[in-house]
Structure formats: structure tokens, C-alpha cells
């Protein structure tokens, strides 16, 4: 009668046992006819190594084990084992016997383990999980980290032998179809799958309505239909839900099993104008995408943090969530239902395919799992099946083979699109393209779905903001009868960087604000876009990325630990008419050049136009040329990264030995001197250095989409540095410290009018004696090249009391 949940409690991980709560009969919780045991903590083995300074992260096979005593009283019950998600392959063993295998890391799966269990004894369960590359399982590659582990709940379920299905795609076996809905009435058809013959009683209730239906089970399925007059419709503003309680009785009328589901009543369509209509009202779909990872946790998030995400997206003013690039679990979808977010959901078919039957079969299985596990959710209004599938095609050097590959890929997309329509004819399908529309259109991808999603980053990866307008116009002329969504747009930004002179790839909040201030109004006003989803709600793990926040894609409106950025407040100000958010987005404190006071530490971000606030809340100012009575550099030019799209203002490398990467990713190269006119006294001078160039061509992030550094012919760098009258140092950063490593060099100097710097190799500084305040004395750092050009990344001058 009762459903029992026995949890895995011991994790065996790379030879190390990690224990959760010990098994205790007293910890069983009963709810109605059910009882369940608290689950072990969700886990990934990549929570930390995906962001460390070592390239790559662990991708391999690991084992979770548990021993579970199954009471003899369970001998007449059925047992199934359910896993919410394990990335990306899983092999289940019970008492040493192989039970089953599952491919795919983002959907739930379940196995009937009854034949393998020993009642009245301790049973040994082993779940082997691998996140190793497998050419037959999507995603093959992607701009996100493939965390390994059992990161959603796993449990052993005991039911009576007669029960609602636990093996049908790991659902509760009850499905609600609501294709006929209007203001005046709604028709709902309910199907319940069972393990055997019996009678099903269904109680549908909500919003003042209640009705009991009865149906007999035939061939493992019971079906009933009802009409609800004047239904309380579901929408983002009024997310009204109904419930259906399902009871299964045996032939003697004895209650055997009970489950419940929620559902919503709404109707929607994309109209003749290609806009989205919900319950007869035109709605512009606007919101974001979300990745399911969190700083220091990977993808093993507790429900509390997942709930916070969805509430923050709603509070931003969003009505739409693109659940990308994979299904994200029952709890997330329940939240979208209950607070009112329209959703698209997609399988992780990203970047490329493998031209094998096994790969295609796994794609189809993922579609089946996605649809069956999410079809009851009223929030889901779009099924999607691929993202940027031609972004990383093989055979680029062989035009004939490339063309054949593209045709094979298009065939797979057409097959998946047809399968989605067969699985669920009530929801439209979507394919998402990167900014290479001509190639997709040429091979027929644009005809392989009901909706076309466009990922456009004009003004970030290349071009200018106006490229968005031109691309949308081009696509709508080619597809006049196809609804279009702007499914991705965004600019990487680090909240620590602010500037009055924003430029592409400076990672400043201010450039990101410029970007979104063009894109969001365009989406809202465009008569050709049904909506848009900013990429992304949160900064997310992408191990191969090497920007201002290495190993993260930092296009999020909030940080990886969910601190809102100014871009979040900008969206809130527009979508919620919140003037407070608008003021927050407009705030930028200007720091003006002025004579340096003895008590004011001077911190300069060389080669940069940005203010940088470090983790200790110390502000580093942008560089300036030397001015009499103040401070600044003499000679040189800002370091720039040369790409096929032009020169960018910062190196795209992971700076080792620091989290303040932006300080070291910019620099002034060819610098001759740095001078500050200071009151007499003792100062600590810290030169921050890092070598940003190498003689060999580095393998940079493939996701910078053409913004990878080009070879500069760099042959090395060696320089002599002298601080005031201290002995000079000869520095070769690569030989002495290694490339891309933060090197702080600290000096202590005393300055007084009688202690002017002197060096036969000193550069010729501007004569400022006439304008220098009489109570200041120059502090100088002099640079002389031995080979290559001198470099200075950042500098501190700190008065010593």
C-alpha cells in the first residue's frame, strides 16, 4: 500500500568513501499513503576543479554505493530505482547484478529492480556514473561545463504490486491533455498508466471546482475526460493551477496506490502576424535563459537556490524562461508553473552531431524523456531540439564532405522535429541558429521547425549594435511566415570593472549596459520578433573560457553566486517600470585626477580605461599620462589583443596566482617611466607584472567566435626596472616566473627633495619643475628594454606611516 523511498547514503568516489546520514528507521516520513526517507546530498565531482588554474576538469567514471536493508514485509511489493539526473552515462547494479544503463545527463530515469532485490536482507546498490566524452551522446561540445555526478535526487521506491507506472520515463504515470480551452469552458483528458488491472478514481479540483471521475483500467491504461466551465485560466499574471488526485483500487475495491498531478488551463498560438497570443491576448515573450550551476557547487544545487533563481527571474519582470541547453528537472518546472513563467525546453543537441545511428537514437530518447517528463506543465509552450548545430562542424577543409555532413545534420533535425509533433501535437517546435543564417537556410534547417530562434551577438563578438537590426530584417524577409525569437543576446561583464569610455571586450558593466540598452528596446518594439531571452540570467561555468572571470561565461545579469549586476536592474527598470533600478543602472562614480594625498594609496590599472574594484573593495584607477603635480605613465601604448575583428583591449588568458585577473590582462607596453609627485615620506611601491604574450600560438577559447588572438611574432621580453634610487632589477617574466602569472614586486623607498632619482639610463622626463608643487617630490619607476618592450600591468604606491 505505501510507497517507500530508500535513499542512497554512501558515495564511493575515486577510492574515497563519503558518508551522508546513516540509515535510520525512525527517519521515515509518512505522507498519506506514502512514506519516504530523506535523500543524500546532491553531488558533482567537478564543483571546484572546473574553475581551478589547471586546464581541463575531471571527466571519467566514478561509483556511488549504498547498502539498504529491505524489510521482509516488502516481499509483495514492487521496487524501482529512480534518478533525477546523472551526467552523463549511468550503469546500475543491485547485489552485483547488472540492472540497466542510461545515456544522457539531464533527464530522469528509473529501473524496475524487484527481481534483483533480497527481502529481509541488506541489499547492495552500485551506480556507476561517467561524464567522459562519448561521441554517441549529445552534447559533444558546448560553451558550458559538463559536470559529472548524481546531481539530482536518487531514491528506491517501493509500491504495491498494483501501482501507477513508475517505469514510463520515470514519471508518476499520469498525463493531462488540455488542448480544448476557452474562456467559457475547458476540456481535459486524463490518462493514467498502471502496472495491472483495476479501477481508477480521479478527483479534479481547484478554484471552486471539484469533480470525481471513475475509469476502468484496460491494457494498463485508464482514461477519463471532463469539462470545466468558466475555467480559471493560467497565465504569467494569474498562474492558476488545478490538481488531479489519482487513486488506484484493485478488483476488491481496496486502495492500492495514490499519486497527484497539477495542471493549468490555457490556450495559445503564434498568430498570422507571427506574434505570441496567450488566452487570446498578444504577449511579447521576454526574459532570459538559465544554467543550473552555482559558484563552488557546480550543478548540485539545493532546492532553495533553484527557487531563488526563478523568483529573481520573475522579479526582474520576465514572463519567459528559455530552459537551456537541457531539461532542468521537475522542481524548476513546478516553480515556473506556480509563479507564472512561460517556457521553452530543449534537449542538449549543441554545436555538432556524430553521423551514427547510436547518436540519432540517443537524441530521440532524450526527446521522448523531455516531452513525457514535462508535458503536464502549463508553463511549457515550446519544444526545442537543437542549438547552434552548425557552430562547430567538422570537415571545414573538405567542401564536399562538409556539405554531406550538413545534409545529414539537417535530416536528423527534420526527424527530431517530426518526432516532437508526434509526441505532442499541441506545442510548436523550435530550432535555434547562430549568426550564420545563410548556411542554415541553404540546407533547409529553417524549414525544420515551427519557430526559428536567433542567437545574435552583434556588437560583442563582432560588428556593431546595428547588426542586430539588419540581421532580423534579413531573416524576416527570408521567412515571412515563420515566428522568430531572439533566443540569445548578451555581453560579458565583470561588476568589478567600470568605465566612462566603454569598448567592446573590455568586460565593463558600462559596455554591457550599452549593449542591452540597444537590444532590449529593439526586442520590445520589433514587429518581427515574438520575443527574446537574454543570455544569460546567471554567470555560468565554462571551463574553456579565459576572460575577466576565467572558466566562466560572464554574460549573466547576476553573478555566479547570484549577486545582481547593474544589467539586472536595467531589465527590472524597463520591464517593471522601476525608477530605482534605472537610477542604479545609471550610477557611475567618476574618479578625477588630483594631487595625491599622503594618506591616499594610489592604485593604477595600466593600459586600461576601467576602474577596477578588487575583492577587498580597493579601487584601482584607469591609467593617465603623467601630469605635473599628479601622476601618470610616460611613453608606451596600451596592450591590445589582435584578432580578425580588430584589436581588443585585454588579453584573454587565465592569470595564474590571482583572482584579480583584469588587473593583469591589461598593460602598458613600451612604457618608459611611471612618475608620481608626492609629499616627502616613505612609500611602498608594488609593481604588478604578467607576461601576456608568448612566442608560440596559444590555443584560446573557441567560444570567442573569431576574437581569438592572432600571432604577433613575439620573440620575448627582457627589461631593466629601477624604482627611485634603488638598485635596478633585470626582469624576464617568462624565464623567471612563467607566462600568464601574476608577479607582484614590492619595493620600499624614501623620498625627499634631497633624494631625487638619478640613473645614467634614466629616460628623459618632461620638465615639470615650474609646475610641480613645492611640497612634493617625484617618485619615479624607470624602464629600459634589453629585448622586446617593457611592460607594466598595474601599480600601487602606498604611504607608510
Model-derived regions: residue spans:
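Substrate-binding clefts and catalytic carboxylate motifs of secreted carbohydrate-active enzymes
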Residues: 23, 30-32, 59, 86, ...
Amino acid at each position: 500500500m505505501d510507497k517507500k523511498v530508500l535513499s542512497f547514503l554512501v558515495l564511493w568516489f575515486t577510492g574515497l568513501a563519503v558518508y551522508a546520514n546513516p540509515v535510520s528507521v525512525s527517519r521515515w516520513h509518512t505522507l498519506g499513503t506514502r512514506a519516504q526517507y530523506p535523500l543524500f546530498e546532491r553531488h558533482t565531482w567537478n564543483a571546484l576543479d572546473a574553475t581551478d588554474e589547471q586546464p581541463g576538469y575531471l571527466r571519467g567514471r566514478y561509483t556511488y554505493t549504498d547498502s539498504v536493508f529491505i524489510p521482509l514485509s516488502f516481499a509483495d511489493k514492487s521496487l524501482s530505482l529512480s534518478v533525477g539526473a546523472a551526467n552523463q552515462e549511468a550503469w546500475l547494479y543491485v547485489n552485483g547484478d547488472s540492472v540497466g544503463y542510461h545515456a544522457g545527463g539531464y533527464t530522469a530515469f528509473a529501473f524496475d529492480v524487484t527481481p534483483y532485490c533480497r527481502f529481509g536482507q541488506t541489499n547492495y546498490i552500485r551506480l556507476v556514473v561517467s561524464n567522459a566524452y562519448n561521441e554517441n551522446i549529445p552534447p559533444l561540445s558546448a560553451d558550458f561545463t559538463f559536470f559529472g555526478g548524481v546531481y539530482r535526487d536518487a531514491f528506491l521506491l517501493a509500491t504495491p504490486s498494483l501501482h501507477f507506472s513508475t517505469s514510463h520515463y520515470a514519471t508518476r504515470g499520469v498525463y493531462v491533455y488540455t488542448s480544448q480551452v476557452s474562456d467559457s469552458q475547458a476540456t481535459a483528458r486524463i490518462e493514467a498508466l498502471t502496472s495491472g488491472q483495476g479501477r481508477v478514481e480521479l478527483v479534479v479540483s481547484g478554484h471552486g471546482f471539484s469533480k470525481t471521475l471513475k475509469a476502468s483500467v484496460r491494457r494498463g491504461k485508464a482514461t477519463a475526460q471532463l469539462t470545466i466551465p468558466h475555467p480559471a485560466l493560467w497565465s504569467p499574471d494569474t498562474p492558476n493551477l488545478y490538481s488531479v488526485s489519482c487513486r488506484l483500487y484493485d478488483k476488491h475495491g481496496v486502495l492500492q496506490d495514490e499519486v497527484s498531478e497539477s495542471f493549468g488551463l490555457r490556450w495559445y498560438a503564434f498568430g498570422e502576424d507571427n506574434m505570441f497570443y496567450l488566452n487570446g491576448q498578444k504577449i511579447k515573450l521576454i526574459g532570459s535563459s538559465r544554467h543550473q550551476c552555482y559558484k563552488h557547487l557546480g550543478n548540485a544545487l539545493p532546492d532553495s537556490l533553484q527557487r531563488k533563481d526563478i523568483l529573481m527571474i520573475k522579479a526582474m519582470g520576465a514572463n519567459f524562461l528559455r530552459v537551456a541547453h537541457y531539461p532542468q528537472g521537475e522542481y524548476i518546472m513546478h516553480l515556473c508553473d506556480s509563479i507564472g513563467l512561460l517556457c521553452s525546453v530543449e534537449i542538449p543537441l549543441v554545436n555538432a552531431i556524430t553521423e551514427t545511428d547510436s547518436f540519432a537514437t540517443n537524441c530521440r530518447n532524450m526527446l521522448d524523456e523531455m516531452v513525457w517528463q514535462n508535458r503536464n506543465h502549463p508553463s511549457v509552450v515550446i519544444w526545442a531540439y537543437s542549438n547552434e548545430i552548425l557552430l562547430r562542424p567538422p570537415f571545414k577543409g573538405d567542401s564536399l564532405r562538409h556539405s554531406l555532413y550538413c545534409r545529414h545534420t539537417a535530416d536528423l533535425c527534420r526527424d527530431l522535429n517530426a518526432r516532437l509533433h508526434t509526441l505532442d501535437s499541441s506545442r510548436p517546435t523550435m530550432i535555434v541558429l547562430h549568426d550564420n543564417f545563410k548556411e542554415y537556410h541553404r540546407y533547409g534547417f529553417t524549414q525544420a521547425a515551427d519557430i526559428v530562434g536567433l542567437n545574435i551577438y552583434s556588437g560583442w563578438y563582432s560588428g556593431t549594435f546595428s547588426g542586430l537590426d539588419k540581421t532580423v530584417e534579413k531573416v524576416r524577409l527570408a521567412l515571412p511566415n515563420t515566428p522568430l525569437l531572439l533566443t540569445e543576446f548578451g555581453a560579458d561583464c565583470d561588476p568589478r570593472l567600470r568605465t566612462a569610455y566603454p569598448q567592446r571586450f573590455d568586460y565593463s558593466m558600462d559596455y554591457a549596459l550599452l549593449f542591452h540598452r540597444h537590444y532590449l528596446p529593439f526586442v520590445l518594439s520589433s514587429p518581427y520578433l515574438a520575443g527574446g531571452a537574454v543570455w544569460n540570467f546567471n554567470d555560468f561555468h565554462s571551463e574553456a573560457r579565459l576572460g575577466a572571470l576565467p572558466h566562466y561565461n560572464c554574460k549573466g545579469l547576476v553573478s555566479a553566486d547570484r549577486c545582481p549586476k547593474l544589467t539586472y536592474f536595467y531589465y527590472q527598470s524597463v520591464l517593471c517600470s522601476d525608477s530605482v533600478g534605472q537610477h542604479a543602472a545609471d550610477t557611475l562614480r567618476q574618479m578625477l585626477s588630483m594631487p595625491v594625498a599622503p594618506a591616499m594609496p594610489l592604485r593604477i590599472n595600466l593600459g586600461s580605461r576601467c576602474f577596477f574594484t578588487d575583492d577587498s573593495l580597493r579601487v584601482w584607477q584607469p591609467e593617465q599620462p603623467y601630469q605635473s603635480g599628479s601622476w601618470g605613465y610616460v611613453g608606451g601604448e596600451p596592450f591590445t589583443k589582435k584578432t580578425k575583428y580588430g584589436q581588443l583591449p585585454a588579453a584573454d588568458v587565465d592569470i595564474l596566482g590571482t583572482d584579480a585577473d583584469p588587473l593583469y590582462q591589461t598593460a602598458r607596453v613600451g612604457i618608459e617611466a611611471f612618475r608620481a609627485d608626492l609629499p616627502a615620506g616613505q612609500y611602498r611601491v608594488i609593481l604588478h607584472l604578467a607576461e601576456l604574450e608568448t612566442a608560440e600560438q596559444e590555443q584560446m577559447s573557441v567560444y570567442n567566435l573569431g576574437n581569438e588572438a592572432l600571432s604577433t611574432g613575439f620573440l620575448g621580453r627582457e627589461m631593466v626596472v629601477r624604482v627611485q634610487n634603488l638598485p635596478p632589477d633585470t626582469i624576464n617574466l617568462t624565464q623567471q616566473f612563467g607566462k600568464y602569472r601574476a608577479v607582484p614586486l614590492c619595493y620600499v623607498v624614501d623620498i625627499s627633495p634631497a633624494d631625487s632619482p638619478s640613473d645614467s639610463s634614466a629616460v628623459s622626463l618632461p620638465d615639470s619643475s615650474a609646475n610641480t608643487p613645492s611640497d612634493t617630490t617625484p617618485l619615479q619607476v624607470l624602464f629600459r628594454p634589453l629585448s622586446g618592450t617593457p611592460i607594466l600591468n598595474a601599480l600601487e604606491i602606498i604611504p607608510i606611516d
